[in-house]
């Protein structure tokens, strides 16, 4: 069943580990599992996938805690002046993230790292087992929801949103993007999500610590998650020197596109998708996020740069130049060449054209 205690017991059995460290995450897990159980109308396959997903999150927490206890130096790793892309969904954040991440001096979390931030021992020259597992999950999603890929590219080895790291604290809106969980959503809206951002930072430190750095400067993190818009005050508390790139696009265009993506995501877990209810819920959330972002911007104007989706589409490298000037980074020939190669490999609509209209969602 989707019961918090049974999931915790399963994770302990699977890993052979007992210690979660700080267990304040339990409240969020309990509220979430109750909501999924009673409100989400999960079909049997959806319930099975959700159980595996939540157990996987708990397994990572157990393994991470073991490393934090053995290696306190992990939490001393510096995460300096990260670039943070925070704009509403469908505003060019993925394209911009992949472009910036292609600079060899930048460090972005890959999809397979988001699924499991902890590197396991494997023979030199062999494929990381995390990459294999994530490719398998990608294949399953392609089978269950082929249209999803035209909306949002999924690639095991490509940069991924760290919203998935916030999810390890059970204080993120990932659940709302996968299922109808109104009581969890209402509870989450009232929470201080600082513990999720602090845990996210510790996982970034863990990934950085695991990766043997070449001599010289450590890479600079480039992060990207639309949900940061609602919590920029907390993000700046945890990463005080963050440089925030806020992306913009006509909301009438993004609302339908994003509603379509969420509705397809829900369809993996349930046969009962109310597209209009999905759209109304996320429209309310997005309005709240933008209003919260504007309040934070008024207090920290120097931390932000604005980037238009239309300018990114027209001349992405010109926008990168402006971002780098803002962040005090030199745009080197090597970085420029890497970005041009990334652009050529990922043309718009590579995975198909995504068709939708506002009317489909009662907007």
Which stretches of residues belong to each language-model region?
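PAPS-dependent sulfotransferases, especially Golgi type II membrane carbohydrate sulfotransferases
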Residues: 1-66, 74, 180-197, 204, ...
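Phosphate-binding P-loop
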Residues: 73-80
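Short His-Asn-centered micro-motif
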Residues: 86-88, 222-226, 309
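Post-Walker A helix-loop "phosphate-sensing" segment adjacent to the P-loop in P-loop NTPases
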Residues: 102-112
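PAPS-dependent sulfation machinery
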Residues: 113-221
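Conserved phosphate-donor/acceptor-positioning beta-strand/loop module used by diverse small-molecule
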Residues: 235-260, 323
């Amino acid at each position: 069943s989707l019961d918090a205690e049974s999931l915790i017991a399963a994770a302990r059995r699977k890993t052979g580990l007992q210690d979660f460290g700080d267990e304040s995450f339990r409240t969020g897990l309990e509220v979430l599992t109750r909501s999924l159980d009673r409100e989400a109308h999960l079909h049997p396959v959806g319930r099975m996938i959700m159980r595996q997903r939540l157990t996987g999150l708990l397994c990572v927490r157990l393994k991470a805690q073991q490393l934090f206890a053995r290696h306190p130096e992990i939490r001393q790793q510096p995460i300096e002046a990260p670039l943070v892309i925070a704009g509403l969904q469908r505003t060019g954040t993925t394209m911009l993230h992949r472009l910036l991440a292609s600079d060899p001096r930048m460090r972005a979390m890959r999809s397979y790292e988001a699924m499991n931030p902890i590197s396991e021992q494997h023979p030199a020259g062999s494929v990381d087992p995390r990459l294999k597992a994530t490719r398998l999950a990608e294949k399953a999603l392609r089978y269950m929801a082929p249209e999803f890929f035209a909306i949002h590219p999924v690639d095991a080895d490509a940069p991924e949103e760290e919203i998935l790291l916030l999810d390890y604290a059970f204080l993120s809106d990932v659940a709302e993007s996968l299922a109808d969980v109104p009581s969890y959503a209402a509870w989450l809206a009232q929470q201080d999500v600082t513990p999720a951002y602090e845990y996210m930072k510790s996982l970034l430190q863990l990934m950085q610590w695991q990766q043997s750095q070449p001599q010289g400067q450590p890479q600079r993190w480039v992060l990207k998650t639309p949900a940061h818009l609602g919590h920029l005050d907390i993000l700046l508390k945890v990463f005080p020197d963050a440089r925030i790139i806020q992306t913009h696009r006509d909301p009438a265009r993004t609302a339908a596109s994003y509603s379509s993506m969420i509705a397809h995501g829900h369809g993996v877990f349930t046969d009962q998708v109310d597209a209009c209810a999905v759209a109304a819920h996320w429209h309310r959330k997005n309005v709240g996020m933008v209003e919260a972002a504007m309040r934070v911007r008024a207090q920290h104007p120097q931390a932000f740069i604005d980037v238009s989706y239309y300018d990114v589409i027209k001349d992405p490298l010109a926008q990168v130049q402006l971002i780098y000037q803002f962040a005090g980074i030199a745009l080197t020939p090597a970085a420029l060449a890497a970005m041009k190669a990334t652009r050529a490999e990922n043309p718009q609509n590579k995975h198909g054209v995504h068709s939708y209209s506002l009317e489909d969602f009662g907007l």
